[in-house]
């Protein structure tokens, strides 16, 4: 099926690529795709294209990669050029998903039907850069995807549609991300079809109550503070998979913790102390309870289940992981 609605798409990571693919597969024209500039990544730090750029190029969609859309920012000339490109590209609506650049009011005003954002939370909870991570870290029972009509605020626009998803006890950011991306793709295609049919989309202002912010994840947050309760640390490990992972330091070596669950058997051991190192998991004492670590990675190594890790890097009861500086 082909559609008459023309969609400029702005997004960068896999979450956004899923939405772009759904829009394209549904038959909506995408006369322009915006994504962030290629970034160095991987061990070789070679420039890599975003997931959105890769999809667009594979399907013959025009791509632009401005470093900014703000005339008053660090790249005024590039921003001005990008804004002129937007004005010169015939389109009806812009869809934005995890783009990573601020859209000033000047840009929001260009599309006839404005800009629709696909946000991976149940707004107004978890506005901001890392809603999936923060929902798991906080122990939320559910999250979801919200479509909103963008305004100049940070994820403050009126809500068009939302979908709820339960957070499973073993969900990581990686697994939850994939379900949310699929839901977001489904929602945006449905909304675009309604917009084409009706010429408008009803939207409801976000409530003033329940606002929280999902700050961007920093590498410094990876360190596991064994003084915390075991259930808190287990959520942290799940929330930080795939990035930045949980980090436990032993004798100066940073060991990444990729899977863990609360366990019994702490005894009176000090936080960070290895209580047991068994093939089914390494039990570490926490501030409250104990954590059974079931997947680890030594520096320069691969993720391994506890059995394989211990075969090459033995650990023993009584060893103690370092405690990070408080605060």
From Swiss-Prot:
Enzyme Commission number, as recorded: 2.1.2.9
CDD domains: FMT_core_Met-tRNA-FMT_N, Met_tRNA_FMT_C
Molecular function GO terms recorded: methionyl-tRNA formyltransferase activity
Catalytic activity: L-methionyl-tRNA(fMet) + (6R)-10-formyltetrahydrofolate = N-formyl-L-methionyl-tRNA(fMet) + (6S)-5,6,7,8-tetrahydrofolate + H(+)
Coiled-coil positions: none
PROSITE patterns referenced in this protein's UniProt entry, alphabetically: GART (PS00373)
Residues binding (6S)-5,6,7,8-tetrahydrofolate: 121-124
One Gene Ontology term, aspect cellular component: cytosol
Keyword Membrane: no
Top-level enzyme category: transferase
Protein keywords: Protein biosynthesis, Transferase
Annotated family: Belongs to the Fmt family.
Function per UniProt: Attaches a formyl group to the free amino group of methionyl-tRNA(fMet). The formyl group appears to play a dual role in the initiator identity of N-formylmethionyl-tRNA by promoting its recognition by IF2 and preventing the misappropriation of this tRNA by the elongation apparatus.
PANTHER family: METHIONYL-TRNA FORMYLTRANSFERASE, METHIONYL-TRNA FORMYLTRANSFERASE, MITOCHONDRIAL
Record protein name field: Methionyl-tRNA formyltransferase
């Amino acid at each position: 099926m082909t559609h008459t609605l023309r969609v400029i798409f702005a997004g960068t990571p896999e979450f956004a690529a899923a939405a772009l693919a759904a829009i394209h597969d549904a038959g909506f024209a995408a006369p322009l795709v915006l994504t962030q500039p290629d970034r160095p990544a991987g061990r070789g730090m070679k420039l890599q294209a975003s997931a959105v750029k890769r999809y667009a190029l594979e399907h013959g969609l025009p791509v632009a990669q401005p470093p900014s859309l703000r005339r008053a920012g660090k790249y005024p000339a590039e921003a001005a050029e990008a804004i002129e490109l937007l004005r010169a590209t015939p389109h009806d609506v812009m869809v934005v998903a995890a783009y990573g650049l601020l859209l000033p009011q000047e840009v929001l005003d260009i599309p006839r039907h404005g800009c629709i954002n696909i946000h991976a939370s149940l707004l107004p909870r978890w506005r901001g850069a890392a809603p999936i991570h923060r929902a798991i870290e906080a122990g939320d029972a559910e999250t979801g995807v919200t479509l909103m009509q963008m305004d100049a605020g940070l994820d403050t626009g009126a809500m068009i549609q939302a979908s709820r998803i339960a957070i499973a006890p073993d969900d990581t950011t990686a697994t939850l991300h994939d379900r949310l991306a699929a839901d977001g793709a489904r929602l945006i295609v449905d909304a675009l079809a309604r917009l084409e049919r009706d010429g408008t989309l009803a939207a409801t202002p976000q409530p003033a109550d329940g606002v929280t912010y999902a700050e961007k994840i920093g590498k410094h947050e990876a360190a596991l503070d064994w003084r915390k309760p075991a259930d808190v640390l287990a959520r942290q490990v799940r929330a930080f998979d795939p990035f930045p992972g949980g980090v436990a330091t032993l004798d100066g070596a940073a060991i990444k913790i990729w899977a863990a669950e609360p366990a019994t058997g702490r005894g009176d051991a000090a936080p960070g102390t290895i209580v047991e190192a068994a093939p089914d998991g390494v039990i570490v004492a926490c501030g409250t309870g104990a954590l059974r670590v079931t997947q680890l990675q030594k520096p320069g190594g691969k993720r391994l289940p506890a059995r394989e890790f211990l075969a090459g890097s033995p650990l023993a009861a009584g060893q103690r992981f370092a405690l990070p500086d408080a605060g």
